[in-house]
């Protein structure tokens, strides 16, 4: 018997969401029925799987039944492949790697991964220059507010966001059939373009980097505190809550909070502050993407529970 995940919000902390679909839990022993099958073969929609998020590495798998795109590749190549294996995803099935900016925790093994897996590598020109990647030969560069098209109808829109000296972008992914997901980390504030695009999403993964009071009381030097909390730094729990309150709508089904600082934040603080800001009108789920991932405990299906996806 399948159970809707929304009724068991705190039972299992899995971090795979299927935009536009109902999410189900299923007994662990049932997994043997689907051993060796890619979970994307069983769904029609947009899958978002966080392989891990934080200052030591970031990677998010965006999938449809016909396409796998890795947004950021900040872990070592070995770690990334190990995390994909936990998700039962063959690295050679990755069609593309999209890098949001040049910082190592987002781009570290992207070039090696794209070459080994035969996946195309996409980034903006600023990222390519800072990483020393050769446009055309090694990567395809994109501009701001440019749509990237991938196999099977998946597309991604690149939204420029402010973060330190990097040319960072947020990603709005679409499956071409109405399901949309926003992936946004490493920014000091939300731009109007970003807010506009997030307002149409069914799923949002967004950073909630620090608790303001913890940052002020913490051991960081004042210069670093100012950088983190500045326009080009990171989003606080409060800022993230305000953004989600503004963009929340009846179609928003799930939120994942990412890139939490281990020194200046805590999962329960981030979750409670965001939920308080979003209010009772939001009926979806809020979860945390941890540094050590992925945590795969969810099954997802379409309208008929018999169409399952292994996670």
Task: Cite the ranges covered by each PLM segment.
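Conserved beta-strand hairpin/beta-sheet module of binuclear metal-dependent hydrolase folds
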Residues: 24, 33, 39-87, 168-186, ...
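Active-site neighborhood of phospho(di)ester-bond hydrolases with catalytic His/Asp-centered motifs
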Residues: 71-74, 95-102, 123-125, 182-185, ...
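Active-site metal-binding motif and surrounding structural segment of the metallo-beta-lactamase
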Residues: 76-123
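Active-site environment of divalent metal-dependent phosphoester hydrolases
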Residues: 103-107, 129-130, 166, 190-192, ...
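Metallo-beta-lactamase
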Residues: 123-178
């Amino acid at each position: 018997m399948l159970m809707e995940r929304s009724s068991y919000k705190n039972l299992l902390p899995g971090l795979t969401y299927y935009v536009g679909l109902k999410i189900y839990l299923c007994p662990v022993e049932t997994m043997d029925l689907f051993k060796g099958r890619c979970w994307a073969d069983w769904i029609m929609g947009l899958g978002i799987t966080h392989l891990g998020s934080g200052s030591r590495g970031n990677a998010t798998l965006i999938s449809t039944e016909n396409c796998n795109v890795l947004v950021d590749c900040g872990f070592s190549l070995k770690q990334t492949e190990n995390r994909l294996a936990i998700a039962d995803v063959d690295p050679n099935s990755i069609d593309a790697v999209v890098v949001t900016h040049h910082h190592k925790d987002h781009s570290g093994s992207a070039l090696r991964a794209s070459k080994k897996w035969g996946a195309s590598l996409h980034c903006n020109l600023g990222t390519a220059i800072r990483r020393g990647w050769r446009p055309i030969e090694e990567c395809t560069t994109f501009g701001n507010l440019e749509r990237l098209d991938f196999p099977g109808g998946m597309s991604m829109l690149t939204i420029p966001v402010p973060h330190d000296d990097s040319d960072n972008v947020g990603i709005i992914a679409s499956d071409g059939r109405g399901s949309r997901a926003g992936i946004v980390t490493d920014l000091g504030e939300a731009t109007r373009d970003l807010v506009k695009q997030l307002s149409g999403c069914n799923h949002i993964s967004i950073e909630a980097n620090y608790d303001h009071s913890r940052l002020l009381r913490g051991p960081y030097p004042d210069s670093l505190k100012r950088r983190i909390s500045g326009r080009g730094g990171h989003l606080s729990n409060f800022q993230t809550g305000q953004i989600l309150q503004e963009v929340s709508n009846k179609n928003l089904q799930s939120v994942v909070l990412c890139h939490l600082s281990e020194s200046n934040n805590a999962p329960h603080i981030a979750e409670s502050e965001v939920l308080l800001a979003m209010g009772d009108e939001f009926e979806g789920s809020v979860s945390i993407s941890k540094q050590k991932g992925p945590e795969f405990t969810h099954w997802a299906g379409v309208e008929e529970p018999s169409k399952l996806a292994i996670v």
